[in-house]
Design a protein with these regions (language model features):
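Bacterial Sec-dependent N-terminal signal peptides
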Residues: 1-31
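Acidic, contiguous N-terminal accessory segments
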Residues: 22-159
């Protein structure tokens, strides 16, 4: 009877062990207390952080080669800081995405707005340079992990 019970439980137990071994054991949240201070910081209602993992995608505007290079630059930063490889794409994605966008009506071409929710990060710059400066803020906020065994997270908030 014990062998029969063990043979039924073994596949399920193996699946649980395999699933938990492939996921980061913990999450380390970075902090957005950066210098220079943003003009405005709005704390999010939901304090759940945005978690960066292997399924995270950096999305850039299609046909914008400068933004493609900027997205690759951010992916390299994330890999160096956290050990996690993220994808880069020009295809829209609404969840687990870092979305880079340009809005020339923002007023200042080197300004940017950074909105972080548990589902996505939206970085909008007044120009490609503004997006680049916003990436510097993300870079400063990322925890240094390097091994990929601990997930990196960004606190939920909005900055301008």
């Amino acid at each position: 009877m014990n062998k029969k019970l063990l043979s039924r439980l073994a596949p399920g137990l193996f699946a649980v062990v395999l699933f938990t071994a492939c996921r980061p054991a913990a999450t380390v949240k970075g902090n957005l207390d950066v210098i220079p201070q943003p003009q405005e910081i709005v704390l999010a209602r939901d304090t759940t952080p945005f978690i960066i993992d292997r399924s995270t995608t950096i999305v850039y505007p299609a046909t914008n080669e400068k933004m493609h290079r900027t997205a690759d630059f951010l992916a390299t930063f994330i890999k160096e800081m956290t050990g996690t490889e993220v994808r880069v794409s020009d295809k829209e994605k609404s969840s687990n995405a870092i979305i880079l966008a340009v809005d020339s009506t923002m007023g200042h071409p080197e300004g940017y707005k950074l909105q972080i929710t548990p589902e996505k990060v939206l970085l909008t710059g007044g120009s490609e340079a503004g997006v680049f400066y916003g990436i510097q803020t993300i870079h400063k906020a990322l925890p240094i992990l390097k091994d990929g065994k601990v997930a990196a997270a960004l606190p939920a908030r909005s900055e301008e």
